[in-house]
């Protein structure tokens, strides 16, 4: 770039910063462009699939799936992880179905959790916006988009037609919310339900509620499905669950994660550690026996899970090694070309 253009650009950048404040415009290569802060989902496999070690702060995240697939469980686990980091969390319960006892079992500190049960969709989104603008709340969960009923629909009669009202409400709210979310660095998670489109001949007939706005504004979209049952004898004690990263603006998308959700306990982290440990050759498997650092830790996966629950130091050690191996590798690779250029 010639000198005149450089001077003109510097003057323009100075004017923009003077008028709109520092950070209104920046070069992506500047040191101020920090790595995106992430909050763990409580599942190691999902954190790895997301590429940055969790859900990104200052962004909108959508989690959708069929009924009883684990959507609320996943968000409550994320809240529990955020609270461990000393963060303030809020739960906007539009479905009026939050179970505090279950949330407590998943590790959520109920006493510190902010909960709102709004009457209308407008009220829910206004509360969400006020919490975000305060800059004091780090995680806001809206459960769910399908339950955000517009005021006109609530005040109208049962048979009245209200075409596109919810989609318009979501579009308007997200236009208003996104700038505030970025400025306050708040993680906003929308839980959504699945509906079927009528008359679809080719492709998937599934769609999410609330129009298309959320699909565009979300930086991360997770599709969560139940793929099987976990049985103890004849009794079903949990679900095998698969999460697909359908959209990801902060890392490569389309990755998958499989894990177990145990009833009354949440995500079984120990089972993930065993599977990933064997895959990465951190945990040795010979027949039905599992060993770590040359020490036998159990026969059969169920016994090893029990052993790791009792020996938290070992499970933390395995988790740290897996995170270092599977997450930091990406950062190192990203930095290598820059070092080559400097030379």
Swiss-Prot record:
Q: Can you cite an annotated GO cellular component?
A: cytosol
The signal peptide here is none
Q: Does the keyword ATP-binding apply?
A: yes
Tell me the organism.
Pseudoalteromonas atlantica (strain T6c / ATCC BAA-1087)
| Location, primary (coarse class) | cytoplasm
**Subcellular localization:** Cytoplasm
Supply the name of the protein: Protein RecA
- Function noted in UniProt: Can catalyze the hydrolysis of ATP in the presence of single-stranded DNA, the ATP-dependent uptake of single-stranded DNA by duplex DNA, and the ATP-dependent hybridization of homologous single-stranded DNAs. It interacts with LexA causing its activation and leading to its autocatalytic cleavage.
- What does the record give under GO molecular function? ATP binding; ATP hydrolysis activity; ATP-dependent DNA damage sensor activity; damaged DNA binding; single-stranded DNA binding
GO terms for biological process, alphabetical? DNA recombination; DNA repair; SOS response
The gene designation is: recA
Report keywords, A-Z.
ATP-binding, Cytoplasm, DNA damage, DNA recombination, DNA repair, DNA-binding, Nucleotide-binding, SOS response
What family does this chain come from, according to its entry?
Belongs to the RecA family.
Q: Which SUPFAM superfamilies match?
A: P-loop containing nucleoside triphosphate hydrolases, RecA protein, C-terminal domain
Which CDD domains did the record assign? RecA (cd00983)
Reading the lineage from the top rank, the first entry is: Bacteria
Q: Where does ATP bind?
A: 65-72
